[in-house]
């Protein structure tokens, strides 16, 4: 991987996460056309799932982007930003696949959410605990 600063790494992962949101949004539009649902979900199960794929990503992604940027700004090394960003991105790619296989927690959905929550928890821990105990980033 190219050598980059922590802020550049945060920018890289933020850009990739934004692309995931765009892809999921386009899929919602395509589903709307296919299912002939103009507004809302129309009670259509396919439309509901498509909208939730996007909605779930839209709920978590801004938090992750903010955390990546804050970690970079306070001085964490780029490898930590890459690790958190890559893990979160992997979770955001896997999770919608799990929603494709009906109700209940299929393995892809569980793995996707685990890979979403884990980097968010690590980021939260670094942002909260380190300043409280005087631990320097890096």
Regions found by a protein language model. Give the residues of each.
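Interfacial loop-to-transmembrane junctions
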Residues: 94-121
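Mid-chain, well-packed structural core segment of small domains
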Residues: 64-65, 71-101
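N-terminal signal-anchor transmembrane alpha helix
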Residues: 7-35
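Juxtamembrane boundary at the C-terminal end of a transmembrane helix
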Residues: 125-138
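Short, strongly hydrophobic alpha-helical membrane anchors
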Residues: 1-7, 136-138
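Cytosolic, membrane-interface loops and tails of multi-pass inner-membrane proteins
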Residues: 26-51
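Physicochemical signature of membrane-embedded alpha-helices that form the seven-helix bundle of GPCRs
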Residues: 13-16, 51-54, 84-87, 112-115, ...
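Core segments of transmembrane alpha-helices
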Residues: 56-68, 120-121
């Amino acid at each position: 991987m190219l050598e980059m600063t922590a802020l550049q790494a945060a920018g890289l992962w933020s850009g990739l996460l934004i692309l995931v949101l765009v892809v999921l949004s386009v899929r919602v539009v395509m589903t709307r056309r296919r299912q002939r649902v103009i507004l809302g979900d129309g009670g259509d199960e396919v439309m509901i799932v498509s909208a939730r794929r996007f909605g779930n990503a839209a709920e978590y992604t801004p938090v992750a982007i903010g955390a990546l940027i804050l970690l970079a700004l306070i001085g964490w090394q780029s490898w930590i930003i890459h690790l958190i960003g890559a893990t979160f991105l992997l979770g955001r790619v896997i999770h919608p696949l799990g929603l494709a296989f009906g109700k209940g927690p299929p393995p892809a959905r569980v793995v996707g959410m685990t890979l979403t929550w884990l980097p968010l928890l690590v980021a939260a821990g670094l942002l909260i605990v380190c300043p409280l105990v005087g631990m320097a980033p890096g």
